[in-house]
Amino acid sequence: MVTLTTLLKLGNTFFDLDPAGVGFVFNLNFLGTLLPSQVFCKGMALRGQGTVINISSMNAFRPLTKIPAYSAAKAAISNFTAWLATHMSEVGIRVNAIAPGFFLTNQNRTLLTNPDGSLTPRGNTILSHTPMGRFGTPEDLFGTLLWLVDDEASGFVNGIVVPVDGGFAAFSGV
């Protein structure tokens, strides 16, 4: 089972954040991970085996500007992944997460690129701090996903969050 929920809502400033909007983003992401886990883990537990892959975000490790509810929700998913791994391992279920960095998708394209395809200032800043020098593509997640679901390759891997960010988290700025 792979859980993936996401939606970015931007506020003007911290003081402009709408509690209902924050709740919506947090609930969509966190409850969108919790509820499917409850449903599908029940069947996996009855079979005595299974693998859960949650989708967190590099925002869980280092919150980024303009999206505090999203960052908080993804941090909750990372924490929940570790918690669930501890409890589900007793019934043969491994639980891990993947934390994508900056991926150029329809969801964030307008934040990272201009209509003509050039980079926005935010997009330029991100790429200047990404050693691989590009945004991720959904296909960049496949290898990590396949590794985590393969019991032979990762059968003793449980409760971790794997960064897939082109080196963004490793870059020190110098």
Task: For each feature predicted by the language model, list its residue ranges.
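Catalytic Tyr-X3-Lys loop
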Residues: 1-2, 8, 15-34, 49, ...
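Active-site helix of classical SDR
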Residues: 37, 73
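Short, small/polar-rich loop/turn modules that mediate ligand/substrate recognition or access, typified
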Residues: 89, 94, 156-158
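C-terminal substrate-recognition "lid" of short-chain dehydrogenase/reductases
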Residues: 134-164, 169
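Active-site loop immediately N-terminal to the catalytic Tyr-X3-Lys motif
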Residues: 15, 62-68, 90-91, 133, ...
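Residue(s) in the substrate-gating loop at a strand-loop-helix junction
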Residues: 57
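Alpha-helical segment proximal to the catalytic Tyr-Lys
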Residues: 42, 86-90
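Active-site loop-to-helix junction immediately N-terminal to the catalytic Tyr of the SDR YXXXK motif
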Residues: 12, 63-71, 83, 111
